[in-house]
């Protein structure tokens, strides 16, 4: 089951480093190709909270088998997509059909295993949940360069078949409850899909189109707001709501969801912004970027057994606090970034961030879900995982907005001091001009000015990246303010593991 979850999370990021190759292969425009990522995220974010209801209706085994088998078929369809329209449809199906695997694994770990065994299981699940987005760009870049972009999807076929078969024969610990179909809340489902889908679209596309200045962003924001109001009114009044929000009455679960949102910002934000810096400022290719990003994954592996041991010796709240400080410090060190930073300058910030992720995931999983009774865990797991995904969407939207606004600000401020009336600037331009003249280039003076403009642009980008890292660090440090509100976890009655597989 964990392997299936790994595939579903991996496919969020695996295409990110190979978008240009997919665009060329499908003859897509820049606006169209962005939907390869957006369609997957919108569809997945709708399925994640729905998975709690479906697992109670169908049983964990049947839901997971349907999800894994359908995800595998959708992956094959993506690999043979004949144009951009078919790729977008298949990616949406892949995200929706595979989305159930993620919360189902989280829920099963708390239902199947007693409290004394959950630390080791949480380490494994946390490692998979954080490793997948970390190595996604690395693996994607390698597959595309070594073979072709089609292998970004074909790689899912063999594991998908094995996972589907294994779960069908080995996982048996609950039964379907088809009585839930009576009075099924179709209106609630439609409102939830509109609410979450519109919200994800606004977050994903808003920064690129200047938010509400764009008519489609404004329209979806209005639709999402109205659908959200209708959805919450529906789930609070329906006899059998599509999503049960009563788990939020548990203080630890509510706080755990807030921490999950914060982790989503950091996890997906860092995986997005570091490769962006290496591509835009350093000019590295996808494989070189992947090698640098792999440092984080290595230290996640190293820290996994350490996190498991610490969870047995430390108060989980203290462990969470250490993780927040460590992650915040890892990204704060990136605020000193320059245009010359590469592997070794990024090594320790990446290493600290990688180690901190395991110190965050294990205690948050236990604090959020460990005190809930078994009958609430399936539904709560969907909500908990939804918050991490929404944190990622919120974080990327914030990063892209800051990148646009702060780059313009830094660029204008630098330009105020970089004028040809400045003797040092004039001397630099003269040196560039002489260099281009010696190289035999036409119009060396114009080329020299353009080179100076590029230097200003690059420095503005570096300062903007530093601003993003600072905001991310402050968010994790601010998370410490929530720590006193957490209660020490005490297993709920009947929360011990049971069943077999």
Give the residues covered by each predicted segment:
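Membrane-embedded alpha-helical segments of multi-pass transporters/permeases
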Residues: 76-80, 164-169, 229-233, 332-335, ...
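Small-residue-rich alpha-helical segments with characteristic i,i+4
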Residues: 131-137, 141, 346-430, 484
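Symmetry-related core transmembrane helices of the 12-TM Major Facilitator Superfamily/SLC fold
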Residues: 153-168, 192-195, 220-224, 467-484
């Amino acid at each position: 089951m964990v392997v299936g979850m790994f595939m579903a999370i991996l496919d969020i990021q695996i295409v990110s480093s190979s978008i240009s190759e997919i665009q060329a292969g499908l003859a897509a425009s820049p606006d169209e190709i962005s939907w390869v990522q957006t369609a997957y995220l919108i569809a997945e974010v709708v399925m994640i909270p729905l998975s709690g209801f479906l697992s109670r209706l169908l049983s964990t085994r049947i839901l997971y088998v349907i999800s894994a088998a359908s995800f595998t078929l959708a992956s094959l369809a993506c690999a043979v997509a004949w144009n951009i329209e078919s790729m977008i449809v298949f990616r949406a199906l892949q995200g929706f059909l595979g989305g159930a695997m993620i919360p189902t694994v989280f829920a099963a770990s708390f239902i199947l295993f007693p409290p004394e065994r959950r630390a080791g299981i949480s380490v494994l699940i946390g490692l998979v949940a954080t490793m997948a987005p970390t190595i996604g760009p690395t693996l994607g870049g390698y597959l595309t360069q070594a073979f072709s972009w089609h292998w970004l999807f074909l790689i899912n076929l063999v594991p998908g078949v094995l996972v589907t078969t294994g779960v069908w024969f080995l996982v048996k610990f609950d039964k379907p409850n088809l009585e839930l179909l009576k009075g099924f809340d179709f209106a609630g489902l439609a409102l939830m899909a509109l609410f979450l889908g519109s919200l994800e679209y606004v977050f994903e596309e808003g920064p690129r189109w200047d938010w509400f200045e764009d008519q489609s962003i404004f329209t979806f924001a209005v639709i999402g707001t109205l659908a959200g109001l209708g959805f919450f009114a529906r789930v609070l009044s329906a006899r059998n709501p599509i999503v049960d929000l009563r788990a939020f009455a548990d203080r630890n679960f509510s706080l755990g969801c807030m921490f999950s949102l914060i982790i989503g910002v950091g996890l997906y934000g860092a995986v997005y912004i570091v490769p962006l810096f290496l591509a835009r400022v350093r000019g590295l290719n996808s494989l070189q970027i992947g090698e640098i990003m792999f440092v984080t994954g290595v230290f996640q592996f190293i820290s996994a057994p350490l996190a498991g041991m610490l969870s047995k010796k430390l108060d989980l709240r203290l462990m969470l606090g250490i993780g927040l400080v460590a992650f915040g410090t890892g990204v704060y060190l990136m605020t000193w970034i320059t245009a010359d930073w590469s592997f070794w300058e990024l090594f320790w910030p990446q290493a600290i961030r990688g180690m901190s992720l395991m110190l965050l995931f294990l205690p948050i999983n236990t604090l959020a879900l460990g005190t809930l009774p078994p009958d609430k865990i399936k539904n709560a797991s969907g909500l908990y995982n939804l918050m991490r995904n929404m944190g990622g969407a919120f974080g990327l939207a914030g990063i892209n907005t800051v990148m646009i606004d702060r780059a313009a600000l830094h660029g204008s401020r630098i330009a105020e001091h970089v004028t040809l009336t400045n003797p040092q600037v004039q001397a630099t331009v003269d040196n560039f001009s002489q260099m281009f003249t010696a190289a035999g280039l036409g119009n060396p003076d114009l080329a020299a000015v353009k080179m100076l403009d590029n230097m200003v642009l690059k420095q503005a980008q570096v300062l903007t990246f530093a601003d993003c890292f600072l905001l991310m660090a402050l968010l994790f440090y601010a998370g410490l303010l929530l720590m006193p509100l957490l209660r020490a976890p005490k297993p709920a009655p009947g929360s011990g593991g049971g069943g077999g597989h």
